């Protein structure tokens, strides 16, 4: 909203001229690119960095989930050592699911940074 005030409204005067429609639209796009200010680009890049940072917060949740899984494995093994193999297979499954969600969050952060 604030960035719109910084851009000069040249498109109205270009569209009001009597030039052919294709030429007017081309000039309107060019005028929009010319009137973009440095402040608008800075705001866009700041929003991109904030979004990428917010997307990678999920990696911390993944780390906490992995800690919970292996903490529960140790407690379960201490209570019943005969179920070692079954508990370990469940722990590996929980680790894989938690790690996959963390990798999705990290991938989205990189996509926001480098693909947009």
Swiss-Prot record:
Q: How is it modified after translation?
A: Trimethylated by ATPSCKMT at Lys-84. Methylation may be required for proper incorporation of the C subunit into the ATP synthase complex and mitochondrial respiration.
The protein's UniProt keywords, in alphabetical order, are: CF(0), Hydrogen ion transport, Ion transport, Lipid-binding, Membrane, Methylation, Mitochondrion, Transit peptide, Transmembrane, Transmembrane helix, Transport
Q: Where is it predominantly found?
A: mitochondrion
Q: Write down the membrane topology.
A: Multi-pass membrane protein
- Read off the Pfam families from this record: ATP-synt_C (PF00137)
Single GO molecular-function term?
lipid binding
Its function, per the record, reads:
Mitochondrial membrane ATP synthase (F(1)F(0) ATP synthase or Complex V) produces ATP from ADP in the presence of a proton gradient across the membrane which is generated by electron transport complexes of the respiratory chain. F-type ATPases consist of two structural domains, F(1) - containing the extramembraneous catalytic core and F(0) - containing the membrane proton channel, linked together by a central stalk and a peripheral stalk. During catalysis, ATP synthesis in the catalytic domain of F(1) is coupled via a rotary mechanism of the central stalk subunits to proton translocation.
Matching PANTHER family, A to Z? ATP SYNTHASE LIPID-BINDING PROTEIN, MITOCHONDRIAL, ATPASE PROTEIN 9
Supply any other comment.
Answer: Derived from a bicistronic mRNA produced by trans-splicing that also produces excitatory amino acid transporter (glt-1).
Q: Which family does it belong to?
A: Belongs to the ATPase C chain family.
Name the record gives this protein: ATP synthase c subunit
According to its UniProt entry, this protein's organism is Caenorhabditis elegans
